[in-house]
């Protein structure tokens, strides 16, 4: 009797767990759909002139000013092919004397500190605003003395550059530039959450049906 109760508890625990995983995937599906819609709206929106109080993800903006290459930051990153390198994050001062962190794009690891990555034309830039994502537990600590960063901690960035920035990073859009290669922002994000949800729910139903079958079979025997 005791073993039967333990078995029943275990089966219903597994079913509940898998149902919870399915529900979590539906929550993630809603989040991903909202994200795709938000990015889509930003990509379709006309660019507006940058000002420091803009606090909207994926807002397309235009800014005019100058880069400060002396305080450039190298953020460890993989490109679309999985090759290791760096995102080049450069302070930019607008004509209104506001400071922005510009993600100018990706470079190979051996291009770090090379002069070729700092050749720019003109003072006007266009891009999308992204809210800075805080460091998660899986990322290593920044090696600030080597100017190798794994996450953007604004407190440390402010100390490193001697400037103050808000929590939004400007991602440069310029198809004419190849080094650094600007990140291409699209709405083509992987979205398999519905498939995963159906899988978890299907497993839960299968386990429940097998449980009923074997329980009925044991009663007959």
Predicted feature descriptions by range:
Residues 1-52, 59-221:
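Surface-exposed, charge/polar-rich loops and edge strands
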């Amino acid at each position: 009797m005791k073993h039967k109760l333990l078995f029943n508890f275990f089966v219903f625990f597994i079913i509940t767990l898998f149902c919870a995983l399915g529900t979590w995937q539906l929550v993630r599906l809603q989040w991903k759909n909202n994200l795709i819609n938000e990015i889509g709206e930003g990509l379709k929106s006309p660019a507006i002139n940058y000002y420091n109080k803009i606090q909207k993800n994926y807002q397309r903006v235009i800014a005019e000013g100058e880069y400060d290459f002396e305080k450039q930051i190298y953020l460890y990153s993989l490109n679309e092919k999985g090759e290791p390198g760096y995102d080049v994050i450069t302070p930019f001062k607008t004509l209104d004397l506001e400071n922005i962190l510009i993600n100018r794009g990706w470079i190979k690891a051996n291009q770090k500190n090379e002069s070729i990555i700092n050749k720019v034309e003109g003072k006007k830039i266009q891009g999308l605003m992204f809210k800075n994502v805080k460091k998660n537990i899986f990322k290593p600590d920044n090696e600030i003395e080597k100017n190798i960063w794994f996450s953007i901690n604004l407190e440390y960035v402010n100390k490193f550059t001697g400037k103050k920035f808000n929590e939004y990073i400007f991602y440069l859009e310029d198809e004419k530039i190849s080094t650094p290669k600007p990140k291409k922002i699209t709405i083509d994000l992987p979205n398999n959450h519905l498939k995963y949800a159906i899988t978890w729910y299907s497993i839960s139903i299968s386990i429940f049906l097998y449980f009923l079958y074997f329980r009925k079979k044991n009663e007959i025997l």
